């Protein structure tokens, strides 16, 4: 995608110290907060190398001037960040989704982007999940919600 000039948009997931004071939340959300997943002390802190908030080392070479890192989402979807705004301001109407949690974050991003009027395709083999059942559930839902669900190889072939 980068080689063909496509922009990459990243919707990061960060929790800050002040988020530990939330008065309620779902079980998955509480697990993430309790385990300090995606944790940074505050918005102005550099990401600690190797922390849950850091980018995977193999992907870091792709972070460049054609990579737009949105403001962070907090729970699962992009409703609390500026992903849709960034996509629209860059003239994007079609999105190819990939990500680490198919049945929660990828699914939530898919649904919100579709509801916001974007064409959304999912690279199914570029998503992960906490177990096969969760992955299978996500793939089933992608088939109902996404414009298309396909392999990464098919995505690259069609770019």
Regions found by a protein language model. Give the residues of each.
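Generic beta-sheet signal
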Residues: 11, 123-125, 152
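A short glycine-rich beta-strand->turn/loop micro-motif centered on a GG-aromatic cluster
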Residues: 96-100, 116-132
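Anion (oxyanion) recognition and catalysis
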Residues: 2-3, 114, 143
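Short acidic/polar active-site loop segments enriched in Thr and Asp
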Residues: 7, 93, 119
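Short acidic-hydrophobic, aromatic-tinged amphipathic segments that line or gate anion-handling sites
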Residues: 70, 147-158
């Amino acid at each position: 995608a980068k080689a063909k000039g496509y922009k990459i948009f990243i919707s990061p997931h960060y929790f800050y110290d002040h988020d530990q004071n939330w008065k309620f939340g779902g079980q998955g959300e509480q697990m993430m907060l309790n385990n300090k997943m995606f944790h940074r002390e505050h918005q102005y802190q550099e990401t600690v190398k190797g922390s849950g908030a850091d980018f995977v080392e193999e992907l870091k070479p792709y972070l460049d001037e054609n990579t737009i890192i949105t403001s962070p989402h907090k729970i699962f979807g992009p409703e609390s960040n500026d992903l849709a705004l960034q996509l629209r301001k860059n003239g994007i109407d079609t999105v190819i989704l990939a990500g680490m949690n198919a049945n929660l974050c990828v699914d939530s991003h898919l649904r919100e982007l579709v509801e916001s009027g974007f064409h959304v395709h999912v690279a199914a083999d570029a998503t992960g999940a906490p177990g096969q059942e969760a992955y299978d559930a996500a793939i089933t839902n992608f088939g109902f919600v996404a414009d298309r669900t396909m392999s990464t190889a098919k995505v690259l072939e069609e770019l």
